[in-house]
Amino acid sequence: MTKLSRKLQTQKRHRRLRRFLIGDATRPRLSVFRSNNHIYAQVIDDSAQTTICSASTVDKELREKSEKLPSDCNSSSIVGKLLAKRAIKKGVKQVIFDRGGNIYHGRVKALADAAREAGLEF
């Protein structure tokens, strides 16, 4: 049996997880996408098929603070705090965390911890 690449393993985990993670109006889904250089997070209402709010390391608000945010845990925690602030402003307090097939470690964990500290419950 051949070994799958890390990207294919992540995609396979994501498909398996998405069967059970469904966000609605009361508890939307906090979806995380991690690339080599950036991290993106969205709060999604799957029943209405709308994105309630989003944040990433390429946001204007974050780029104004510094020219280039490094792809590390510090920038991920900044994104998590910003996303939580935007979600609470829209009236969302509880979410379902969708790690996107990524292992709950490093940048994904930093984003989740920062969102929890800023007031989101999951």
UniProtKB/Swiss-Prot annotation:
<comment type="subunit">
    <text>Part of the 50S ribosomal subunit; part of the 5S rRNA/L5/L18/L25 subcomplex. Contacts the 5S and 23S rRNAs.</text>
</comment>
<keyword id="KW-0694">RNA-binding</keyword>
<dbReference type="GO" id="GO:0008097">
    <property type="term" value="F:5S rRNA binding"/>
</dbReference>
<keyword id="KW-0699">rRNA-binding</keyword>
<dbReference type="Pfam" id="PF00861">
    <property type="entry name" value="Ribosomal_L18p"/>
</dbReference>
<keyword id="KW-0689">Ribosomal protein</keyword>
<dbReference type="GO" id="GO:0003735">
    <property type="term" value="F:structural constituent of ribosome"/>
</dbReference>
<comment type="similarity">
    <text>Belongs to the universal ribosomal protein uL18 family.</text>
</comment>
<comment type="function">
    <text>This is one of the proteins that bind and probably mediate the attachment of the 5S RNA into the large ribosomal subunit, where it forms part of the central protuberance.</text>
</comment>
<protein>
    <recommendedName>
        <fullName>Large ribosomal subunit protein uL18</fullName>
    </recommendedName>
</protein>
<dbReference type="GO" id="GO:0006412">
    <property type="term" value="P:translation"/>
</dbReference>
<dbReference type="InterPro" id="IPR005484">
    <property type="entry name" value="Ribosomal_uL18_bac/euk"/>
</dbReference>
<dbReference type="InterPro" id="IPR004389">
    <property type="entry name" value="Ribosomal_uL18_bac-type"/>
</dbReference>
<keyword id="KW-0687">Ribonucleoprotein</keyword>
<dbReference type="GO" id="GO:0022625">
    <property type="term" value="C:cytosolic large ribosomal subunit"/>
</dbReference>
